[in-house]
């Protein structure tokens, strides 16, 4: 079967190593970057997407997902290049096909051991909302004495809280996302050795591929629960490649739930959750209500362009400068864009207004937000930003982009402000408005706290998870 690969990046190179294990033959690589046209990978030429119009009966595998504003949406491939929906494949459609021929699934008898539940964190628990959520849910399971639940990750002694150390199994994947036969087989062997079991996944990785392949062979011995933390088209594509073996979905926002149902997932197996987090019973804090004082802006999270759009954050800062907004911007976090931000601050002599303060520990994040008037989020893809929820629980006014996750909690003009994705000009205008109308800080900040507080219910949350895991 003739196949085009759309996208010439890392995932394309990975697929080219596994195509020989599938019935597909790669006849070309497509990329939207003109600089790559005419070059080749493994002897296969890279061409313009226009080539798809001439070969619209061929299969097309979209190999990647990128930032949501640049991503090749399947609908666009249908409408613009006349590629039939049934001819569109994802990266994982190919990987599943290949590993059905590569993987070794040992034959075992019926296992009678206690059913155990494994939350996958095999890529490592660095900085990030998903990683924080995994540690938090383990804490709750310990607190509520929920047994037989374990976290799979690298037990390095630095990122694991003491209270959950005995709930962590030292299992990790080297170079997660590369899908080497050695690491995929390692995950397969783990699943088989621990049947019967439930695997709870928060991203598509080697453990998901392994659980899928084992469940195909032992459907009664393995249950798969997918927690969807993201809302971009590529993430939906990836997840739905495993649809036939996923027992339940848990979505971090109602918008994600609606989209999965729209894409063919049965409504009765799709659930939503609001993860609990600490907050004070009463909101006691101060705002920068005097016009002579600068507004205190805050950001907490990964310092990356991918999804978090730190490049847009810098453009926002320049617009604030242009509009002569009085502000101090405290940026908490770390990431690959950190050096670029530091250089930007130095080049524009902003060190008295823009401060990079590094990572803030989870138990100190409330104190961080209590000192900020406004919480900034410029992401182009958010499933449900934990940082934004934490900010609202501390009374910071959210000014955010219109992602599915942010709008789950932020209502424009009620408890914060929402602007279109990448629209840093409108965001700067909202901040300028707040500067000129300081009374809205207390009004919106208090409402943000009230609205977010109503959604937090640890007992209800644990009860929901117990039903999902044990019924």
Q: Residue locations for each model-derived region?
A:
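Aromatic "clamp/platform" in nucleotide-sugar-dependent glycosyltransferases that forms part
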Residues: 380
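Conserved acidic donor-binding segment of nucleotide-sugar-dependent glycosyltransferases
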Residues: 412-413, 417-424, 433-438
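Short His-centered aromatic/hydrophobic patch
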Residues: 201-207
């Amino acid at each position: 079967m003739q196949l085009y690969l759309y996208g010439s990046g890392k995932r394309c190179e990975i697929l080219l190593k596994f195509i020989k294990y599938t019935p597909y033959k790669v006849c070309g690589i497509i990329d939207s970057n003109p600089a790559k046209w005419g070059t080749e990978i493994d002897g296969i030429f890279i061409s313009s997407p226009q080539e798809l119009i001439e070969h619209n009966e061929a299969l097309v595998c979209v190999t990647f997902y990128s930032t949501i504003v640049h991503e090749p949406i399947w609908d666009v491939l249908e409408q613009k290049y006349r590629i039939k929906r049934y001819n569109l494949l994802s990266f994982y459609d190919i990987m599943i096909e290949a590993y059905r021929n590569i993987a070794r699934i040992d034959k075992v008898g019926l296992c009678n051991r206690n059913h155990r539940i494994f939350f996958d964190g095999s890529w490592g628990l660095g900085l990030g909302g998903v990683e924080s959520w995994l540690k938090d849910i383990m804490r709750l399971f310990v607190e509520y004495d929920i047994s037989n639940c374990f976290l799979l990750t690298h037990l390095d002694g630095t990122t694991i809280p003491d209270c959950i150390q005995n709930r962590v199994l030292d299992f990790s994947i080297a170079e997660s996302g590369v899908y080497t036969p050695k690491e995929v087989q390692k995950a397969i062997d783990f699943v088989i050795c621990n049947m019967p079991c439930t695997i709870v996944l928060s991203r598509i990785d080697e453990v998901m591929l392994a659980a899928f392949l084992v469940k195909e062979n032992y459907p009664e011995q393995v249950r798969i629960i997918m927690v969807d933390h993201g809302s971009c088209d590529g993430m939906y594509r990836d997840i739905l490649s495993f649809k036939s073996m996923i027992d339940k979905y848990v979505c971090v926002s109602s918008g994600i739930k609606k989209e999965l149902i729209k894409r063919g997932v049965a409504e009765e197996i799709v659930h939503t959750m609001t993860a609990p987090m600490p907050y004070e019973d009463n909101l006691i804090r101060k705002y920068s209500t005097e016009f002579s004082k600068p507004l205190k802006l805050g950001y907490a999270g990964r310092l990356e362009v991918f999804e978090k759009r730190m490049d847009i954050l810098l453009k926002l800062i320049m617009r604030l400068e242009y509009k002569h907004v009085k502000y101090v911007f405290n940026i908490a976090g770390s990431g690959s864009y950190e050096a670029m931000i530091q250089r930007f601050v130095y080049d524009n002599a902003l060190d008295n207004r823009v401060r990079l303060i590094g990572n803030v520990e989870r138990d100190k994040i409330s104190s961080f937000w209590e000192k900020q008037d406004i919480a900034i989020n410029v992401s182009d893809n958010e499933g449900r930003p934990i940082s934004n929820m934490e900010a609202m629980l501390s009374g910071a006014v959210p000014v955010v982009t219109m992602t599915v996750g942010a709008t789950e909690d932020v209502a424009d003009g009620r408890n914060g402000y929402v602007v279109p994705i990448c629209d840093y000009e409108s965001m700067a205008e909202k901040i300028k408005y707040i500067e000129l109308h300081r009374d809205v800080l207390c009004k919106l900040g208090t409402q943000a706290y009230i609205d977010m507080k109503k959604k937090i219910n640890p007992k209800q949350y644990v009860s929901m998870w117990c039903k999902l895991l044990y019924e």
